[in-house]
């Protein structure tokens, strides 16, 4: 945990046991939502080491988010050192390979008191961790999604392209409504035209049609996911045509297969999408071949199971060890 006053440099961080924070009721993060977070995982690799996957990308995304929200960016080296030190101090909580991961939550917030709507006078950066079980128990399984015409995640010119804490609470009710109707999550459409797919809850969307992979382009309303960019690079290296473009919901519902990606699931197959009175099922309810290939190969890269892939270092995506047994 480290602090920084507005206009100063970040001070040295210190390691401490997990505990409650002391914040003023006037803290900027409490009153105005001036804060952001990142989501990462430390995993047990095939060789027994504990590895992180492209953590420098999280550090850079956090810097961009901090600038957008008027907070002092955390230097990349400081961010990475904080993450690695926290993981090292919690190695006993990293599950065996394939049994889960140590989830890592870097958090940057305006902790200083400010009554007016303005940047906080002081900021706090911290990293905490928690062990989590495998996202898919028994293997990757297709999920069902519902397209929302009522709710939108973000609008042009807003903060949809950064991992701001205020982006997530508004999605809780739509998600709860979808689950009540038997669906796993919501597909959000764009707020301007109400017809282009943006995100799936807190995940990035992809669809495959006649061997061509499409994903919504980054226009400031969609989070630039680390898994998203990794899937794009990996798919292109395997010879697939990948387009970052506007993806109409009708095009996606006519696709051969669809999937979404994120830190938690890596790649999640979409088995069914409902929009209005239309319901489409993909691949007979099974995982599509392209989806499965990308899931297996990216997971292999993340866990250093290199027997399943070729030339991972050329992609610049190989995980690196923070601690070797």
Give the positions of each predicted feature.
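Helix-start/capping segments and mature chain N-termini
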Residues: 1-86, 107, 114-306, 310, ...
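Extended, Lys/Arg-enriched charged tracts that mediate electrostatic binding to polyanionic substrates
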Residues: 97-105, 109
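Charged, gly/pro-rich active-site loop segments
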Residues: 76, 86-97
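Short helix-terminating capping/connector loops at secondary-structure junctions
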Residues: 95-99, 138-140
């Amino acid at each position: 945990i480290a602090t920084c006053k507005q206009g100063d440099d970040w001070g040295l961080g210190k390691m401490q046991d997990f505990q409650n924070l002391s914040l003023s009721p006037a803290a900027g993060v409490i009153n105005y939502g001036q804060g952001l977070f990142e989501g990462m995982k430390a995993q047990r690799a095939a060789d027994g080491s504990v590895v992180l996957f492209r953590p420098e990308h999280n550090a850079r995304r956090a810097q961009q988010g901090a600038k957008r929200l008027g907070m002092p960016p955390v230097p990349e080296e400081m961010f990475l050192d904080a993450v690695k030190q926290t993981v090292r101090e919690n190695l006993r909580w990293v599950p065996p390979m394939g049994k889960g991961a140590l989830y890592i939550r870097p958090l940057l917030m305006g902790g200083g008191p400010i009554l007016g709507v303005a940047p906080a006078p002081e900021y706090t950066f911290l990293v905490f961790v928690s062990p989590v079980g495998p996202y898919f128990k028994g293997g990757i399984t297709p999920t069902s999604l519902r397209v929302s015409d009522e709710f939108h995640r973000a609008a042009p010119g807003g903060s949809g392209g950064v991992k701001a804490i205020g982006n997530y609470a508004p999605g809780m009710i739509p998600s709860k409504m979808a689950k009540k109707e038997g669906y796993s999550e919501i597909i959000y459409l764009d707020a301007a035209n109400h017809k282009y797919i943006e995100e799936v809850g807190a995940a990035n969307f992809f669809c495959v049609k006649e061997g061509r992979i499409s994903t919504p382009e980054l226009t400031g309303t969609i989070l630039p996911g680390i898994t998203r960019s990794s899937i794009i690079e990996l798919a292109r290296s395997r010879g697939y045509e990948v387009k970052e473009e506007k993806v109409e919901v009708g095009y996606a519902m006519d696709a051969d297969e669809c999937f979404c990606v994120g830190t938690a699931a890596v790649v999640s197959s979409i088995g069914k999408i409902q929009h209005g009175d239309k319901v489409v099922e993909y691949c007979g309810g099974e995982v599509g071949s392209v989806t499965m290939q990308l899931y297996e190969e990216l997971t292999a890269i993340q866990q250093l199971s290199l027997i399943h892939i070729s030339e991972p270092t050329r992609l610049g995506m190989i995980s690196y060890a923070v601690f070797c047994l």
